[in-house]
């Protein structure tokens, strides 16, 4: 009985090694019959990428295609795909960013981040105009609307070198977004 107990662990190791290899020499490699249940992974859906808006549409909207930036400092944030452009020279007075993510309009109804919500019409869409809490309403504005399962947000940030902009930021943003309307998801 003692002798059998000594060999049981050795036999178990041999059986495991034999089941993991399809060849007699070399390193053990697991084959399909020994791996048990197959693991399936599904990647999370990815929001529509606003950087795919054609350059011609960006130019028609008054933005500079040469200033396109994917993400914020190159990174998407909080599940949103992000793309931004400066206004066209010589003014280069503001920066527009488009954010797309799997959220609802409730996202901008968060009083800890956004305020001054009001309904607006932007192009063919019913939207919600908003301000970020820390933003100067004389220089910045945001607008949001839903397209299918995605929330599309756009923001305008006026450059700090522009003291008193010759435009209303919300009116300017709505004009830019309306010009891009046909390129955005529906």
Regions found by a protein language model. Give the residues of each.
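A domain-level signal for the structural core that forms small-molecule/cofactor-binding pockets
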Residues: 9, 21-25
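A small/polar (G/S/T-enriched), proline-flanked helix-loop surface module common
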Residues: 24-186
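C-terminal motif of bacterial Sec signal peptides marking the signal peptidase cleavage site
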Residues: 15-19
């Amino acid at each position: 009985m003692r002798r059998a107990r000594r060999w049981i662990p050795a036999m178990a190791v041999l059986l495991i090694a034999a089941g993991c290899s399809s060849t007699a020499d070399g390193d053990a490699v697991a084959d399909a019959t020994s791996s048990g249940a197959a693991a399936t992974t599904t990647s999370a859906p990815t929001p529509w990428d606003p950087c795919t808006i054609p350059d011609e549409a960006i130019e028609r909207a008054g933005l500079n295609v040469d200033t396109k930036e994917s993400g914020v400092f190159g990174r998407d944030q909080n599940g949103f795909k992000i793309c931004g452009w400066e206004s066209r020279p010589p003014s280069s007075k503001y920066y527009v960013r488009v954010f797309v993510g799997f959220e609802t309009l409730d996202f901008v109804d968060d009083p800890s981040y956004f305020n001054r919500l009001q309904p607006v019409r932007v192009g063919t869409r019913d939207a919600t105009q908003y301000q970020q809490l820390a933003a100067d309403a004389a220089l910045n504005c945001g607008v949001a609307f839903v397209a299918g399962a995605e929330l599309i947000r756009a923001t305008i940030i006026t450059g700090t070198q522009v003291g008193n902009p010759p435009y209303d930021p919300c009116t300017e943003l709505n004009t830019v977004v309306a010009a891009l309307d046909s390129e955005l998801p529906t």
